[in-house]
Amino acid sequence: MYKIRLRPLAAAIILSGCSSATFAQLGQNLSVDIRSLSMGNAVTADPPGISAIHFNPAALTKIEGLQTDVQGILANFDIKREFSVPAGYNVFGYSDDPMVCNDGPEVSSDLCTDFKGTVNGDVEYVSLYVPILKKMVDLGEGIPMAAPTAGIAYKPPGSKMTFATAMYAPLVAGFGAENGNAGNYMGQQVALERITYLSPSIAYEVNDALSIGASVGMSYQAIGLKTDLRFPNELIGMLRMIDEVVCTPFKENQDIITDILLLGMCNTEEGMNPFGRFGQMQLALEQSLSPSYNLGVLWEPTEDFSFGMVYQSSAKMRLKGKYHIDNAKAPQELIKGLMSSPTGQILAAILGFPSVVPASESGLVSMDFEYPAHFQAGVKYKVLPDLQVNFDVGWTDYKAW
């Protein structure tokens, strides 16, 4: 069993599976509070009860006595994904990519003569990483994700201080698809979760108009990924050209001279293809305790107007877990061919290639990961006795990803 640190390429694959910051934003604050979610989370200046622990802990001063809160949220990730290629699409002169090309085996051209146009790779079901099982679980097509939340708060009679804690999920998102889905190279199964299981909080009423508050979140962070791998780049395209053009006359006539001159790359049973499946990678990483904090201010000069601000800190982590990679035959054959030639062995050493590519490999893995900081400010204004307007502006430091 090997132990490695996750390289930037693998990290990029994980985050590309999350479809950039847009997908992350979709999962942010999805399962914290129903009322806040229905208002687009524009509640920084409008106290959402115990859930103010997350949105603005200063608003906890609005609670009187003992209060509990239990909620259940259902979410369905019915996400549409479309893929297309630009005009002139090719990799080292090849464009017969079966993902976007209709050409069958009867067409011998290396250039696609009939592109498919837009290719759909829709999400088919919700996937979640289950901590106890330490693996991802598919909920099945059409079954929504269920996210329960619970909290308790207490403000002693006559006191200016409020104490609270809650359990909620500030970030939870996951999706999956069956084999053959066009989106599987961006993640066949992806799960990104942050569950806050304890959040001791305190709020203080400075005066009738001003309150301040703080909370400390103790969270569980997990990332799960299963993705097909392929690398449609110029190097792989060149290797295909060598296999199909240069090596063809020597496939059945190998000798030591051709092995030395051609680096052993013709001694393969299957050549590299930029559009072929390179393998499949599975990852499961987690951290049981990831602390962060929230700081909030609430100013209510009148009953009709209020202003609130909240800062939610980042959380830097070293996620640890396991990986498993199933390698396709082509990369195994490439390394096997290079190792059959003395010049191929020299080239492999220069390029840092391994001496062998096993059919599968697994081991321990670690990854530096940062949950991004977030700042939000908002106002609440009662236009009429029965009409209220909430307006919030937020910023999330997704560049940390």
Segments from the language model and where they lie:
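Short glycine-rich, polar/acidic loop-and-turn segments at beta strand-coil junctions
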Residues: P57-A59, Q67, G72-N76, F83, ...
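Active-site-surrounding "flap" and adjacent substrate/cofactor-binding loops of secreted or lumenal enzymes
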Residues: I79, S84-D114, V119
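Gram-negative bacterial Sec-dependent N-terminal signal peptides
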Residues: Y2-F23
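A beta-strand signature from Gram-negative outer-membrane beta-barrel systems
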Residues: A52-N56
